[in-house]
């Protein structure tokens, strides 16, 4: 049950189509669904404005398919599955024999079930990544932001090794409501972007780099120690988390954060 379902239920009660007792039962039974291996949070859409997201890593294809089916049966029409590799996606698609299209994007290891919504945010989210090797994380961020109703501008391969590439997009950066800055290696892109814009910057360190990058820890520490004001940092390779936060900011400013 999401916010629209709840509003419809209350409307039905007001119109006499549903009794208060029946409505109460529906609301009381909506919060969770017990699948044995998972307790699905079916009321998250009502509380937070966006339904539960499925984290694919560590789950079997059978578990993912069962979760998707249960969420759809509960009325959640749009479902995001993250960290879903191609082999697991193929098996999950086989198990979804009821016409559910995963909408799989292999570069981002994302599955997007349901139609992409019209943008409802106040402005645009810019997703900027330092190098082509950062694209999987960047696409996870960009597609997640679009999934939650945001207009997204992609600025790819604009790292500090060729600063002119970033400066060529000064206009897009100036018009952004939020910037997601993604970089591995030394992670300098976030600080540079933070010094160019007046909006919030969400930095995403990636695990791209040679030995002393320590799987993204070097970029993480550099971003945490940024001297640029307005830079916040999420975990290594967490494009989803950055995009979700950026979407919240963009929708808060538009007053639509409870209706995504």
Regions found by a protein language model. Give the residues of each.
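Short, acidic/small-residue loops that bind anionic groups at enzyme active sites
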Residues: 101-105, 193-216
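Glycine-rich oxoanion-binding loops at beta->alpha junctions
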Residues: 108-114, 151-172, 217-218, 234
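Glycine-rich phosphate/diphosphate-binding loop of Rossmann-like nucleotide-binding domains
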Residues: 121-164
